[in-house]
Amino acid sequence: MQRRQSARAERVPAEGDWPVAPQQDVEVSEQRIWVDGCFDFAHHGHAGAMLQARQLGNELLVGVHSDEAILENKGPTVMRLDERVMAVEACRWATKAIPKAPYVTSLPWITHYGCQYVVHGDDITSDSDGKDCYRYVKAAGRFKVVKRTPGISTTDLVGRMLLCTKSHFIGSLEKRLSGDEGPGGESERIETGQAMLQRIKDYATDSTGLAPGCDVWYWHASRPAKLRRTTTSNTTQNERPGAARQDTTSSTNPVKEEKGKFHQLVQGKGVKPGQRVVYVDGGWDLFSSGHIEFLRLVTQAEETAAKAQGWFTEEAKKSRIEQTGEDYPPAFIVAGIHDDEVINHWKGINYPIMNVFERGLCTLQCKYVHAVIFGSPFSLSKAFLLTLPYSTPVAVYHGITKFMPLTYDPYAVPKALNIYREIANHEFQNVNAAEIVARIMKGRALYEERQRKKGEKGMGEEAERIRQELERKQRQKEIEGQFGL
């Protein structure tokens, strides 16, 4: 949430001009917390700040700065204001997003919305004059500090794109969590793994940030089962570094299906009586508006079906509360997350931009998700679906996608089982990792300047040459896949 602020005075809206309701001043409460920032292609660092802030009160209001203010004071945004607001509102710990919030945090703004305290990370942020962005709320004794999430920032993610690095990849998440894999000595690896597992547990909490929420699993299976090659002859020894390996052979002699083994990392609330278990999967790389809108539409589809069955009647709600002590939604959405190797196998270059741990945290913080399965297969097999921890899902949702240059359909099995459901195209259909990278590359000069201002190395000619070569190889692979070469 780092950002700079113009020193000019911020206008205090009159009644009727506030960006979102309420228009009348709200009574200030210590249980109502304010955070603010850019939240540009929101990552788990943003979510971590919101989680810690939410733990300090009962409501969390999140100010989101305008595109124009960010451009003037920090540099170009990757995501539009509406996309950034969507990301904030999808976070399970956010109560409400406040768009166009001022850069230098304003006492009249936080007071209007009834927030006693402003929360921010322990990093320093300043305006264009070098003054503290939180000077007014600090002077008023209305500022609280939380620990900044280490190892992740928007600047870091942009750097991965511009420099085309792969050093962030994780070979085996479970080995990383146990300390058996990763940089450093044994004690350092163990300490790092324990910290990572604790962060997963933290992000798996419910909307209060204090109680169990999401279930978290890891699926053990062989490498071919996760990649789901259709033949054993796909493995080659002479593949070029960075190029995507495509399934271009016939479907004879298929890889044997594996049910694998599910290991629970975090126990959450689990499936409640009457809930429909539905499954979604993907890379969830640079978790953004395209992913969020898809998950929202899945939730909406399930709620529409449940409404027709009387789920939302007062009598049904009362029965659920009497039985479990709380009300809950009609669908239990399980999100499968592919390993880094699986994504890079199919997309090439240096995808995924976020590693499996980072992508998992981004998925866990989303209020539409109730369980996460790390290490899910690229192509769904009958063995996998029939042995899910919650039994076979009643539906598998996916968007309208052209899986070229694949020679098979990764969703053939759920279609054969008649549980496949397709979400129609929507406004944010094309917003994914590739689109975000394209936005970055289109405005490369501006982003490089932003990086230099933050003390980061810009992308040089050699890095650009590497990216162009990797993209050329990827295009060649796609052509070969289309014609079965």
Give the ranges of each region predicted by the language model.
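Nucleotidyltransferase catalytic core that binds NTPs
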Residues: M1-L485
